[in-house]
């Protein structure tokens, strides 16, 4: 019997918040059993298939990102879909903390996370926090795409 099945939104949010609660940095070991062996994950940086590749990605993220914080702003679950609106706060050596705002869409199959798509504006959110770069970047984006 596999006890690692998500039953409701509160259970998922509790597991997700624990990732970023450790003083040593992000830890994924407690939530990985809730992911499907055939997990499909995609974000602005990468596309991953399978639990081995996903586990390797979480290990890389944990090694690189010791100073991560996460705030959940809103969430909902309808059927087998979970949506989470979040803010990830990253600390850099030379620059002030940066916030990346995003949304995750999680699809469950038999209580396991089968599909996760994270949507965020990686470059815009980071560049907004680099003083000498932010104004020029935003001016360029507005002129070309606004």
Label each residue range with its predicted role.
Residues 4-8, 50, 137:
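Residue-level preference for long, well-ordered alpha-helices that form the structural scaffold
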Residues 27-80:
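A solvent-exposed, acidic/Ser-Thr-rich amphipathic alpha-helical stretch
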Residues 63-69, 76-146:
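A beta-strand edge to alpha-helix "cap/lid" segment located at domain peripheries
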Residues 1-33, 143-146:
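Short, low-complexity N-terminal intrinsically disordered segments enriched in polar/charged residues
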Residues 16, 35, 58, 86-88:
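Hydrophobic alpha-helical core bundles mediating ligand binding, dimerization, or RNAP-core interactions
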């Amino acid at each position: 019997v596999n006890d690692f099945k998500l039953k409701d939104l509160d259970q998922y949010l509790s597991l997700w918040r624990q990732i970023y609660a450790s003083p040593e940095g992000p830890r994924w070991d407690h939530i990985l059993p809730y992911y499907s062996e055939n997990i499909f994950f995609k974000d602005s940086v990468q596309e991953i298939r399978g639990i081995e590749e996903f586990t390797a990605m979480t290990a890389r993220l944990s090694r690189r990102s010791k100073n991560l914080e996460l705030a959940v702003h809103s969430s909902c679950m309808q059927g087998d879909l979970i949506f989470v609106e979040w803010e990830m706060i990253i600390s850099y050596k030379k620059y002030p903390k940066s916030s990346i705002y995003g949304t995750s869409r999680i699809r469950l199959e038999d209580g396991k996370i089968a599909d996760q798509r994270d949507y965020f504006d990686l470059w815009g959110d980071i560049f907004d926090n680099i003083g000498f770069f932010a104004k020029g970047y935003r001016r360029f984006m507005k002129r070309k795409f606004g």
